[in-house]
């Protein structure tokens, strides 16, 4: 459970850092540039802790997928980025993949055969 909490912290750090990239104007503005560096530092530190308890494939898929969805939603809501129906479908598929990655495998749900 702690791994999933650390994954949320890593995602939040990555989203904050990526959102600040635009404001940093190519690292020419000090405050947003500091937010980018600190945010990515937090993101990768907590991602490294996540990998102690969650398989790397699952952790990276969730981290990158949810990061893309959240950053796209922020850009759409706050910066007026255009998002058509296919964009919403794509984000829905990413969320579905997250839910599938988090679910137990079908093999673990099967009952052992008696013979």
Curated annotation (Swiss-Prot):
It is found in: Cell membrane. Gene3D superfamilies: 1.10.3730.20. One of the determinants for resistance to ethidium bromide and quaternary ammonium compounds. Pfam families: Multi_Drug_Res. It comes from Escherichia coli. Belongs to the drug/metabolite transporter (DMT) superfamily. Small multidrug resistance (SMR) (TC 2.A.7.1) family. The lineage of its organism: Bacteria, Pseudomonadati, Pseudomonadota, Gammaproteobacteria, Enterobacterales. This is Putative ethidium bromide resistance protein. GO terms for cellular component: plasma membrane. Its main location: membrane. GO terms for molecular function: transmembrane transporter activity. Coiled coil: none annotated.
């Amino acid at each position: 459970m702690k791994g999933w909490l650390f994954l949320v912290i890593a995602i939040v750090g990555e989203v904050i850092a990526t959102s600040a990239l635009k404001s940093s104007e190519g690292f020419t503005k000090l405050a947003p540039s500091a937010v980018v560096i600190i945010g990515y530092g937090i993101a990768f530190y907590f991602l490294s802790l996540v990998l102690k308890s969650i398989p790397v494939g699952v952790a990276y898929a969730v981290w990158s997928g949810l990061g893309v969805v959240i950053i796209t939603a922020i850009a759409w809501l706050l910066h007026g980025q255009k998002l058509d129906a296919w964009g919403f479908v794509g984000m829905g598929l990413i969320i579905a993949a997250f839910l599938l990655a988090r679910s137990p495998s079908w093999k673990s749900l099967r009952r052992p055969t008696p013979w």
